[in-house]
């Protein structure tokens, strides 16, 4: 079975093979764009890596330079920080909940507050990683996840 690559659009000024990014989701300003379906072909909160930059360029009112390139992307394994719990086991399906932490200088804040994930996303715990040092004293673990 042949698997077709995922296609999206990304600003021409940053379109390079190997670039990793998190798709933050669709923007309201893009609602009238003729190629928006290609841009929004990705899942909000998922991490991707550009595997190929194609020559096709399209106009864009959002990106600096007003141009976007067509790119092929692959989805990457993602990591989040969760509170330690007996429910957190490899293979378990969990619902992601933001910690809503206000410790803004913490280097882990994005992985604890889950800024880029849809609320209440269901994921499978692929593996349990290292303990995270939480400045607020929570017992946190880094977990690798796959999307359900």
From Swiss-Prot:
Signal peptide: none annotated. This is UPF0179 protein Ta1159. InterPro entries: UPF0179 (IPR005369). It holds the Pfam family UPF0179. Belongs to the UPF0179 family.
